[in-house]
Amino acid sequence: MFFHIVLERNMQLHPRFFGRNLKENLVSKLMKDVEGTCSGRHGFVVAITGIDTIGKGLIRDGTGFVTFPVKYQCVVFRPFKGEILEAVVTLVNKMGFFAEAGPVQIFVSKHLIPDDMEFQAGDMPNYTTSDGSVKIQKECEVRLKIIGTRVDATAIFCVGTIKDDFLGVINDPAAA
């Protein structure tokens, strides 16, 4: 799910960036350092939407660098247990399949795939229904439900299921 939150960060800036464009240099360094990163507590930072305050700089002894406390607004993505997501399948094997929803990788075990789907090995491994009408393979889009998350310092991993109503393949590029 997406959230709009306020975060704080201490930014160190080299003396060569001081001058008329100090604020612009500080904001561009903040965007470069923060956007696209993951903190286990807040999730993935998608975009910085605004700068609330830039505090007074503190000169670091011996280096000349200055540390500025910056308070900024940003959009973060953090998946939760029970959330329904649409994802793209990236890998299929006999244990299940992996899918990606934005920066989050989700594993769906073969035990969390409907019982009527069987694994088919070959050059394009997939899970296929007995009548062949539905096929889960690489690059197809699936709707799944998050049933568990594991949060590390720099990544979020999820376990999902498609063994529920209205879940499963929503778009198969191979069928088109």
From Swiss-Prot:
GO annotation terms (biological process): DNA-templated transcription initiation
First-listed, main subcellular location of the protein, grouped into a coarse class: nucleus
Keyword line: DNA-directed RNA polymerase, Nucleus, Transcription
GO cellular-component term (any): RNA polymerase II, core complex
Keyword Transcription: yes
SUPFAM superfamilies associated with the record: N-terminal, heterodimerisation domain of RBP7 (RpoE), Nucleic acid-binding proteins
One annotated GO molecular function: nucleic acid binding
Compartment(s): Nucleus
CDD domains found in the cross-reference section: RNAP_II_Rpb7_N, S1_RNAPII_Rpb7
Gene3D superfamilies attached to this UniProt entry: Nucleic acid-binding proteins, RNA polymerase Rpb7-like, N-terminal domain
Recorded superkingdom: Eukaryota
InterPro entries: NA-bd_OB-fold, RNA_pol_Rpb7-like_N_sf, Rpb7-like, Rpb7-like_N, S1_domain
Free-text function comment from the UniProt entry: DNA-dependent RNA polymerase catalyzes the transcription of DNA into RNA using the four ribonucleoside triphosphates as substrates. Component of RNA polymerase II which synthesizes mRNA precursors and many functional non-coding RNAs. Pol II is the central component of the basal RNA polymerase II transcription machinery. It is composed of mobile elements that move relative to each other. NRPB7 is part of a subcomplex with NRPB4 that binds to a pocket formed by NRPB1, NRPB2 and NRPB6 at the base of the clamp element.
Family under the similarity heading: Belongs to the eukaryotic RPB7/RPC8 RNA polymerase subunit family.
Quaternary assembly: Component of the RNA polymerase II complex consisting of at least 12 subunits. Interacts with NRPB4.
Protein's name in the database: DNA-directed RNA polymerase II subunit 7
Gene: NRPB7
